[in-house]
Amino acid sequence: ANGVKNLVVQPTHLMHGAEYDELMETVSAYADKFESVKVAEPLLGEVGSDAAVVNEDKQAVAQILTAEAVKTAGYDSLDAAKADGVAFVFMGHGTSHTAKVSYSQMQSQMNELGYDNVFIGTVEGEPEETSCEAVIDAIAQAGYKKVVLRPLMVVAGDHANNDMAGSDDDSWLSMFNASGNFDSVDTQIFGLGEIPEIQAIYVAHTGAVINQ
């Protein structure tokens, strides 16, 4: 009705998960209404085949998110935080979708960058090494005594405020405290979408698909 002939869709999803698939279904249903339809990559880019596969998007997100978390926690560098016994946990949603490997890839990316004190977790505990219990064990075994929890989500909504930082016994904050392994557990309630450098990745993805 508005005379648009060429449609470009920029998903604001984190990855190629179930909601991205639903978007693709919706867009494809209207594809014949336009001369061209292009859908850009979500934040973490292409999924890749296994847990060891990383890409430029994952590296950029890992660096940007970690730098933001370190700064918010009051440290000059990740090394300074590590020296003070601090571990950072970035908590995603988790999924049974095949895209769950993206979380494992983000952990691989952190390891590749030498971010020894950064751990990836998920609310759903899928993949299983991202469950709250698994992450608590990993951090305790590594010897860190202070923990900072922060969402690995575009928007810090219900999951961040309740599942991560809520007062219920089954929140991550409560379970980390209840484990008795840590001297302090702090939370940072900020979504990825609030960070200008993250916004720039989405814009770059839009530009890339327009220029294809």
Predicted regions and their residues:
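Extended amphipathic ligand-handling, pore-lining, and cofactor/metal-binding catalytic surfaces
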Residues: A1-Q212
